[in-house]
Amino acid sequence: MEGSYWWLSLLALLAWGANGESTSPAETSPAPTTPNPPVVNPSLRRKIVNQRILSAMGMDSDPSNEALNGVCQSIHSNGCNANELKLRLADFFIDTNSSQCYDEILVKKPCSSLTPAHNSHWVPRGLDKSEVDKIFDTKLKLFFSQSRKVTCLSASALNPSQFVKHFQVKIQETSGPAKQSLRSLHCVNLVWSHSHKGEKEVVHVLQSAVPVKLKNCLAMLNFRQCYYNQQSEGPVVVPSYQHNGEKWVTGAYTMTVEVDKHADGPCEISTTCITEGSEIKPGVHSLRGFKTTLVIHGKRNTGRRLLSSSNARQECSSGTFLGEGGSAQVVGPKNDGPGDHITFCNGSVVTKIRLGQEHGCYTVRRIKTYRNCRPEEGSSACEVDDELKPCGAQKCMNVHLSVKGLVKTSRGSNVQVHSCDKDCLIQIPEGFGDIQIDCPGGTQHYLESNVLDVDCPMYNRLGGLMLYFCRMSHRPRTCLALFIWLGAGYGITCIAGYMVYYAILALSMLTRCLKRKYMVKGDFCLKCEQKCVTSLDQTLHDESCSYNICPYCGNRLPEEGLRRHVPSCPKRKQRLEEIDLYLDYLLVPCPLHFALSTAVKLGTLLKRLSWVTVFLCLFLTAIAPVQGQVTTSPVLPSNQSTECTLLPPPVFLIFSAVLMSKTLKRMGPVNKVGAAGHSARRTNSPKNLYKSKQIANTKSGPREPRRRVVVKALLILTASSALQSIHLAQAFDSGSLPEGAWEEEMQLVQGCNQECSLEEDECSCPDGQSMTRKLLFFKGLNSAASKMASSHRLLTSVSIDTPWGAIKVESTYKPRLASSNIQLAWNSIEEQGDKVILSGKSTSIIKLEEKTGMQWSLGSESAAEEKRLLVSILDYTQVYSSTFQYITGDRTVSEWPKATCTGDCPDRCGCSTSSCLYKSWPHSRNWRCNPTWCWGVGTGCTCCGVDILRPFNKYFVTKWTTEYVRTDVLVCVELTDQERHCDVVEAGSQFVIGPVRVVVSDPQNVQTKLPSEILTIQKLEGNQVVDIMHATSIVSAKNACKLQSCTHGSPGDMQILHTDNLIQHSHDGGLNLADLNPLVNSTWMSWEGCDLDYYCTTGSWPSCTYTGINSENTESFDNLLNTESNLCERFHFHSKRISASGSTLQMDLKGRPNSGGGELSVLVDVKGLELHSKKISLKGLSFKTLSCSGCYACSSGLSCTVEVRIERPDEFTVHLRSVSPDIAVAEGSIIARRMTGGPLSRLRAFAVRKVKKICFEIVEKSYCKDCKNEDTTKCIEVELQPPKDILLEHKGTIIKRQNETCVSGLQCWTESASSFVSGVGSFFRNYLGSITLGIVLTLLPVAVVLLFFCYGDKLFKLCSCFRCCRGLSRGKVRKELDEDELRNKLKKFSKEGELFGKEKKDARTIALLLSGKGKNYKELV
């Protein structure tokens, strides 16, 4: 019974293995080792051996069953002996000979004698399948039993020296928290890795002898040479082996844990938290600890779960993600380096001194590293809400990601990177132009605001009054200032004159008061016995009283009579006042004298002259013509004369959203296909995709004579094909990039090629295929808002010549380009009946600018109708081939010492990288450099090493070599609203529309290109998570280090040549072969001019020092950014996305220079174009239908459907214009037909403000003599919606513009003045009712101005009752005067009684003003 029970157990084990991770028998079974082995299932045989091996590793129970031993021995002879397996297991983990491999029972054999087993069912974490196939079942083993499956690598494949002698831990118990979180963890034996925040947590266990128990956790346990997953509750089992009678275990390991979603509670890690106890020796502490449980709470699921959602959890959304973390490894003789070190000895003490196994210790080194993460396939969705959300005082974009990731926003040269946790609000970047959003995984969105920037001051206020000023002049603010100055300018001038005058007067009086305050008073006169008031009075007494002369009246008196006369002299008061007045004048500086004198004499003249000057300046500025940059160089035959300039991109940029030729009219079966496909893309439901395919097959079959090409809604979901958290042999592989913005633009125009024609909202192609492609346009703003976030549109129409002339996107008043039509000269003009047949050619050059173009007028003086041919450039980009050179950054380097008491130093001082610098000093032991236990003198060795501790602090930089490949241009040619062809011009293209043939050359004369070497830079400030894809800036690389040629400390002295080096020490995602790949260990570091040395400290090992080493070179990169050219300011990059593949980085580099992008040569060849001549008389020209809908002051504008009837001829080309000045309509051609039931014409209009009625008239109505005005003019009532604050997905817009330019200076000024007068007349007519009333009302302020001019001084005398500046207090200041001049004046003063002569009348007036006795300003002027 026992035997049968044992066989039942084996059969159960076999049944379990059939469902486990295993290889097929034919693929993995080795050759039998006995001549006649029993017939045993190879899978069962493998499980028997594996269980015995796991038992030898201490990871499973030993199946000590005699019958099992008998079966195993019958298969492998004595190979199943437990002791033999333990010996072979030790060799498996110890022997580092790379030529040694191992068979099924771990017998060591040369690799040449063993063939790796092919495995198609299992790939261990961290290893690429191609690498697995090379070593599977020879150096890579999968040991599995009923309880666990363990993957191990032999030391011949991986030798990280992680096994250490096992010691029983002696811990002194202490108190501590029973439960704690990882972020509050402070234990010597446990380290939480600060990595990218997610559902997984990484914990490094530094002392494996301390038991760890898991509960409700999903854990991956990485022991460097082995790893296994643990899902059940229980202790962590550490791999071990027996060698020389001692047990060896992994010293440190890494746990990557997350909450088991099927469990009831959080994940709990129960262990002993060890802390430093009492100090036994200097720097050596005993172990002290307490039982604790680390609690990890999982993220609670909110909302419902879709059936189609994947069970796999994912932690990141981009394959180029790098999260900062850490790693821990046991230090051996060949794997030391910089970083924090901690040493455990004999299971009882802990220290930071590096000690090895010879001391019964092992040292663990903590390393700064980055971890890579790969998203699940098809789960990296990125969407942007069309409607803006309030965030504080601003509006923000709402971005949705499937998981947390980095989102880059850019607008012009303003680039920002934001960390987004599934849903986040991002402020709209400052600047002008479209908003580009780069999502994780490479998805791109181009957005623009729906609210159109009508740069007319206060256009939506004052009842639209300001729009008239914007119509009068290209500079509406100047025009507004002109009219304000005309009405109130003179009053403003007068008020300004008063203010200036009284300011000068107040300053003068303040100066006089301050000087008087500190002026020395006069002395007592001994002759006349009178107190002198001032120093000037003192001088007068000295000069007069000495000669017995009265100082005031000048009479000579006896000495006694002088004393009686002077106090009662009748002229004393008058003379003192005169002296005081003169002194006031002298105390004021000369500049103030001049200013006051000028204000008194020329005040009125200055006021009037100022008013006239300002008026003339404002008037000339208001009517001055604007000057743009001409960007065309027409090349025409000598017998042709044309005027050719380009169209203004500002206007085109305006209508990149306003204008489009087609709007949705019918939502038929094809629309059903688009809607179903759109729904399927949003849900990723195979059922929905199949349903949409069925609809397409049933509705678009062979019955349709033409296939329809439909523009697809582009909702791009980032799809990565790698497994989550898996490091490959070429581990850093992000997968392929999705299509970018430029590829989407190309698809839009290539889907509607020149073999197709536009019919309503579709581009129809005549090959009968069932595949369709639809042009998605607006059908009302509400329907647009629901689709904007996930669709791109090709909008096609002519632009609108706005009568107010003030729509702004980049520059309103000074357009970047001048614009005009080319009047094509004809080689032949033939008249046949009522038709004119034209033939001719024209050649011109269009400089490459975004959203610009050129228009030809196809008409003749003898023709009554005219067609307009538009060749427009939607966009263009320069395509570059980029080659990766190296990765660098502002690295931090650190040193470490190693020493031995006897023997040699470790090879390369224990450094295992190619970037370290080391130096050794043999036989360096002496009493000053020895620890207390080392008595050696002249023995041993000392070495120092220095290496990279942290590769990036503030900057992550990549250097590239670029090569210009080509320039792709998106060109569209349009003749009417139903004849429009688009294509991507690479090697020249030809467009044929009826009798018109347009040939566009290759891009030529490209002047601005990217430098041959560039740097992509990412700033890591405040965010230690790196997404290599998101380069924040691109700069030139003139001052960056060349490849492996650099001085130490310069930008680029560290050069990472293999991308796997970035994750070399990451061990939280399975096995990592990156640190073994010889190509990985190829980082280059410049140590030019650097040297190492050491210094001794008695009683301890020596310490290292260095000279010439820059420990951190952040300042070098700061200086680099200040000196290099910022290419983001000179280029608009459609794509600068970076991906990782094949151990290097790749960059999809496409950009458009802001200027100097080149030019296109355009040949227009017209053969037999038929137009109606002026001999024809139109009959029955009238509107049949007209309808408009949309919003006002928004970029989507109004969509109008119109049908024009005519009785004779059968067809005629007409144009529409708006009667209302607040409505502008496109200038495109419309075909008037006699027959009914034809396609309706569609056009775009724009309303600057809300209106209730729209009126259009036919421009060619003058050719219809019998037509009534009500037939050729149509008015309809409309209900316009206000603009919604939404973002529109980027649109390729075909644009058109007609605006004649002047050819001479006089003509420019004349036309500008005429436009000004016309604008004034429009204001009078539309705002005041009539031009006559406007003139009358305008004359009133003019008359008031003339009244002020002629009688201003008289009018101001009415205000003479107002007085000011009287009774000012006087101060005293001492002033030195010329004595001789003063004596002469005083002598004359004694006789005449005046210090101011007749020629000093202005001085007396100023003195009176300063004393407060003069006239006021109004009386003076």
Swiss-Prot record:
The keyword Mitochondrion does not apply. One of its GO terms (biological process) is fusion of virus membrane with host endosome membrane. Keywords: Clathrin-mediated endocytosis of virus by host, Cleavage on pair of basic residues, Disulfide bond, Fusion of virus membrane with host endosomal membrane, Fusion of virus membrane with host membrane, Glycoprotein, Host endoplasmic reticulum, Host Golgi apparatus, Host membrane, Host-virus interaction, Membrane, Signal, Transmembrane, Transmembrane helix, Viral attachment to host cell, Viral envelope protein, Viral penetration into host cytoplasm, Virion, Virus endocytosis by host, Virus entry into host cell. It comes from Hazara virus (isolate JC280). It holds the Pfam family Nairovirus_Gn. The keyword Disulfide bond applies. Residues 1-20 form the signal peptide. Residues 22-42 are annotated as: Disordered. GO terms for cellular component: host cell endoplasmic reticulum membrane; host cell Golgi membrane; membrane; viral envelope; virion membrane. The chain crosses the membrane at residues 480-500, 611-631, 644-664, 709-729, 1331-1351. Gene3D superfamilies: 1.10.8.1320. Disulfide bonds join 901-1096, 929-934. Belongs to the nairovirus envelope glycoprotein family. Residues 722-776 form a propeptide. The record marks 307-308, 596-597, 721-722, 776-777 as: Cleavage. This is Envelopment polyprotein. Residues 501-610, 665-708, 1352-1421 are cytoplasmic. Residues 21-479, 632-643, 730-1330 are lumenal. The record marks 804, 927, 933, 935, 1101, 1215 as: Involved in fusion with the host membrane. Residues 22-31 have a biased composition (Low complexity). It comes from the Viruses. Glycans are attached at residues 97, 346, 639, 1081, 1299.
